[in-house]
């Protein structure tokens, strides 16, 4: 598996819920050094979608760059943003449309997901 393959591994529904929650709370102008992006990257890595230590380039998996790119992906798919609803995967678009008008439900679901992978 090449580094690009690791970076492009499809996000799961739970992972996308967490990213969308951050996008709705903070927008798309988050930098890779933003504490929220760093924390989300760490949470996604703890979710153990794949055994990270067995990947050829483990630092690339759900890295801060990957998280920032996925946040931008939600912006690209957002019909409320000029030029939205293009270039993103079906699951990304579906989750955005599902929760667009139900942000409280999204925040609640995201909190439940985060609590399962909390370090505290």
Located regions from the model:
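Intrinsically disordered, charged low-complexity linkers and terminal tails
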Residues: 1-120
